[in-house]
Amino acid sequence: AVMGRNLALNIESRGYTVSIFNRSREKTEEVIAENPGKKLVPYYTVKEFVESLETPRRILLMVKAGAGTDAAIDSLKPYLDKGDIIIDGGNTFFQDTIRRNRELSAEGFNFIGTGVSGGEEGALKGPSIMPGGQKEAYELVAPILTKIAAVAEDGEPCVTYIGADGAGHYVKMVHNGIEYGDMQLIAEAYSLLKGGLNLSNEELAQTFTEWNNGELSSYLIDITKDIFTKKDEDGNYLVDVILDEAANKGTGKWTSQSALDLGEPLSLITESVFARYISSLKDQRVAASKVLSGPQAQPAGNKAEFIEKVRRALYLGKIVSYAQGFSQLRAASEEYNWDLNYGEIAKIFRAGCIIRAQFLQKITDAYAENPQIANLLLAPYFKQIADDYQQALRDVVAYAVQNGIPVPTFAAAVAYYDSYRAAVLPANLIQAQRDYFGAHTYKRI
């Protein structure tokens, strides 16, 4: 409801009159009461709401993904005309969007599955928008979407046509997977700085402030520095009194499931999903901590040196995560015939969304230089960072393993990097085993 309200207010603020409808009359009245003088026109029946719109109608749905979306579409259909456009701005599973696009197209309606990132504030002030569906229908809604989207530093709106049917929601799904990876990498960096150097929250805030002024400049690093200094009403640092169980809404899981379907090694993002799952086993972890032994953690040595190693490890880990995510976008584009433009996708992530970061311009540049590049790690800028920073990543992972500090995504980054650059892997033995017990055959060199 909040996302829908904020998007309506965003659209209204760009000079449009907006018809609004909610199943709950009270919620509709609440929005009107809280926003006097706005060009928001309330309707209390679906029929009146639909009939209030100019044709071709442009209807933005912001409902909970799943059965609720189908129910909302079914309630609209009796009053729609051929050529009307439904835009689904929810966190919808892309296969559902493909199905709805097919079904509605057969009935003469247009359906645009649209990823919207930026949370409640982004919805109000300007989100990153990822629309997928019929190109001609997109052209009819593009003027509105362009006006309400976030604007990058170079003045470009953070919206672009992604591709047919489920392409927009697929890109939003991978965006969310990358978000999981970013957050877990940052959490592991925090754990290392706390465990290895015993940094105070004030020192952590200072460290993240410095990081945010360099290569790691991003929304997530920016909010993390603020989190470290936040205190509760009793004067305690808030981060220290928050239970260590990270919840999830399932979009990270979808990204990993799709990777398995496509045969893509999305190891870092998948480890970030599993890290949330193991965090939720709090009671088991507390019990296990009293039974299972581990090494006694030793100090990490020189403070400035270790902080810099963790910074480098975090940046290279982030690059590996994005390399995996964009590699998966390439595989999905081929599988679903979407013809994705990876440079444009990186561009619209530069503002408005949760993963917005300075280094996204480097991804856009890499694809501008070579649109067919198989993996971002092969692009000159990222290859150079890998050359310069891999030792720091290896040192940090080695320290963590020796001292019993879990770093699943940092470790996944090293393993992926070394596997990807390996001309020969021990998979020949696995294939021999498969042939031995199952006559699966093998290829000779």
Curated annotation (Swiss-Prot):
SMART domains: 6PGD. It comes from the Bacteria. GO terms for molecular function: NADP binding; phosphogluconate dehydrogenase (decarboxylating) activity. Substrate binds at N91, S117, G118, G119, H175, N176, Y180, K249, R276, R434, H440. One of its GO terms (biological process) is organic acid catabolic process. The active site is at K172, E179. It is an enzyme of class 1 (oxidoreductase). It catalyses: 6-phospho-D-gluconate + NADP(+) = D-ribulose 5-phosphate + CO2 + NADPH. Its EC number is 1.1.1.44. Keywords: Gluconate utilization, NADP, Oxidoreductase, Pentose shunt. Homodimer. Catalyzes the oxidative decarboxylation of 6-phosphogluconate to ribulose 5-phosphate and CO(2), with concomitant reduction of NADP to NADPH. PANTHER family: 6-PHOSPHOGLUCONATE DEHYDROGENASE. This is 6-phosphogluconate dehydrogenase, decarboxylating. It comes from Shigella boydii. The lineage of its organism: Bacteria, Pseudomonadati, Pseudomonadota, Gammaproteobacteria, Enterobacterales. The gene is gnd.
